[in-house]
């Protein structure tokens, strides 16, 4: 991002409209190409001259695209002719895929610069740890154990594409870019296909950015109003939702509040709430009563529905009591567990026992969901009985073994934070036996005869890398007593959900 900022040194008069000219500069396409190579799950092929023959960046394709954007009349092609109309040997859809990738990279630049400036002066031990999915679990273990209720919300998509354009309009003041963006979005994006999927017509990263920017907008409003929640019943705040002038009205509201409203207007105690958003969901955790939790549910849902045109389904907004209900969170089932502790205390000649109760966040593996995912991918049946993977029998033995080992290690790595690893061993057993059945089927043999011929050493590859490393870190007595299997370990290098972990 620091290297990209060097290309964007414009004077103050041009900073409001610097996006649109970037579409006609070749070095921006090089930046988008290089940015895509350094990230996972990117559509790299759109910058390649011939995907099947030679994977290299083609400046010729970029020049053709820029030339075509200059010729505005040729740019407007009916949607039904996306795949039929060719321009210099490429379909129209191909060029609009390039534009979607480029637009995502360009629009991310001002947002990333603004985000980076917000972290200035703040100290983080290791900034890259914040990118890990597992980094959120230690935070929840420390915070959720003190709370009673959690509001679990599935965040819906906007009901119309124009809402996303309006969201960007509040941040990006470049009218030319927004008109160009609106044209591409309406002409070449079918609403039925508007979802963040790998098989989306346009770049998934493009829609991820639009979705996150829209969610951040109503989150910023909610956080501001939540801080002033004790005074909202006596203060008219509807005028704040004129979105263009909202951030200016915040300052005006604060001045009026300080000068005109005494502190005694706070009829309700301002509750302490933690808000976490993850993977299309969000949770609000608090120690309030059920009545106040329903208040916040009504408050949050109506804010989003009335002012941001997103419709929440009632069955996807739930209030869970952590001591009784399980919270589905990033592939784990989390709940509060009471651990009774007996402490023996002795003062002089008198001794007595003290009963303490420790509240602990319990993270479990959703075994039913994982078995359902394994059954869907033909690793086992719906009851969890391993079956052979017939579609892999054409591969070599080493390739088959490596595939199963990789899946087993990925699942073990992700669920290393489980408080009870018994279900994890069951999953590893299913994959291990499925691997043996697949190899036996390939060699037209039975499982018993195949293992007798090759020996049990074949399955030693399933020993996870974590087991090998942890056996060297922890004392031998500690490792031999198998207490290590009850230890929860959170890794800070997990940046995405494995397909078998994501069950939705």
UniProtKB/Swiss-Prot annotation:
Keyword Cytoplasm assigned: no
Gene Ontology CC: one annotated term: chloroplast
Gene Ontology molecular-function annotations: RNA binding
Protein's cellular compartments: Plastid, Chloroplast
Main location: plastid
UniProt-listed GO biological process terms: mRNA processing; RNA splicing; tRNA processing
Signal peptide range: none
Keywords: Chloroplast, mRNA processing, Plastid, RNA-binding, tRNA processing
Presence of the UniProt keyword Zinc in the record: no
Pfam families: Intron_maturas2, MatK_N
InterPro entries: Domain_X, Maturase_MatK, Maturase_MatK_N
PANTHER family: MATURASE K
Family: Belongs to the intron maturase 2 family. MatK subfamily.
Function: Usually encoded in the trnK tRNA gene intron. Probably assists in splicing its own and other chloroplast group II introns.
Protein's recorded name: Maturase K
The gene coding this protein: matK
């Amino acid at each position: 991002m620091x290297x990209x900022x060097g290309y964007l040194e414009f004077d103050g008069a041009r900073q409001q409209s610097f996006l649109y000219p970037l579409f006609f500069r070749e070095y921006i396409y090089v930046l988008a190409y290089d940015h895509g190579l350094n990230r996972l799950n990117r559509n790299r092929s759109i910058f390649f001259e011939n995907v099947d023959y030679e994977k290299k960046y083609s400046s010729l394709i970029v020049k053709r695209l820029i030339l075509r954007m200059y010729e505005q009349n040729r740019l407007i092609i009916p949607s039904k002719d996306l795949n039929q109309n060719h321009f210099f040997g490429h379909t129209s859809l191909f060029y609009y895929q390039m534009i979607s990738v480029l637009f995502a990279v360009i629009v991310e630049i001002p947002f990333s610069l603004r985000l980076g400036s917000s972290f200035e002066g703040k100290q983080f031990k290791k900034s890259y740890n914040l990118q890990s999915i597992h980094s959120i679990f230690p935070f929840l273990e420390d915070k959720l154990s003190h709370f009673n209720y959690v509001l679990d919300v599935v965040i819906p998509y906007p009901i119309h594409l124009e809402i996303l354009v309006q969201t960007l309009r509040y941040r990006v003041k470049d009218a030319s870019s927004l008109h160009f963006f609106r044209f591409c979005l309406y002409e070449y994006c079918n609403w039925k296909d508007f979802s963040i999927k790998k098989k989306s017509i346009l770049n998934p990263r493009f829609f991820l950015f639009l979705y996150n920017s829209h969610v951040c907008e109503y989150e910023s409003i909610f956080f501001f109003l939540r801080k002033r929640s004790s005074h909202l019943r006596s203060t008219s705040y509807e005028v704040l939702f004129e979105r263009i002038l909202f951030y200016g009205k915040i300052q005006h509201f604060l001045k009026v509040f300080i000068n005109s409203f005494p502190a005694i207007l706070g009829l309700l105690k301002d509750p302490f709430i933690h808000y976490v958003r993850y993977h299309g969901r969000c949770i609000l955790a608090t120690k309030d009563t059920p009545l106040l939790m329903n208040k916040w549910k009504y408050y949050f849902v109506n804010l989003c529905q009335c002012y941001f045109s997103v419709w929440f389904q009632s069955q996807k907004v739930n209030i869970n009591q952590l001591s009784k209900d399980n919270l589905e969170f990033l592939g784990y089932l989390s709940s509060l567990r009471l651990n009774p502790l007996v402490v023996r205390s002795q003062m002089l000649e008198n001794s007595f026992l003290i009963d303490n109760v420790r509240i602990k966040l319990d993270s479990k593996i959703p075994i039913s969901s994982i078995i359902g995912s394994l059954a869907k991918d033909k690793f086992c049946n719906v009851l969890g009985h391993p079956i052979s993977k017939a579609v892999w029998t054409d591969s070599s033995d080493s390739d088959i073994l490596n595939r199963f080992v990789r899946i087993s290690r990925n699942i073990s790595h992700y669920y290393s934070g489980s408080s009870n690893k018994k279900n994890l061993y069951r999953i590893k057993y299913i994959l291990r036996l499925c691997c043996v059945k697949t190899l036996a089927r390939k060699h037209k043999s039975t499982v018993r005869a195949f293992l007798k011929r090759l020996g049990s050493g074949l399955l030693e590859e399933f020993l996870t890398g974590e087991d090998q490393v942890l056996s060297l870190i922890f004392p031998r007595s500690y490792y031999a007593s198998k207490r290590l299997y009850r230890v929860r370990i959170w890794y800070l290098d997990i940046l995405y959900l494995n397909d078998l972990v994501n069950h939705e």
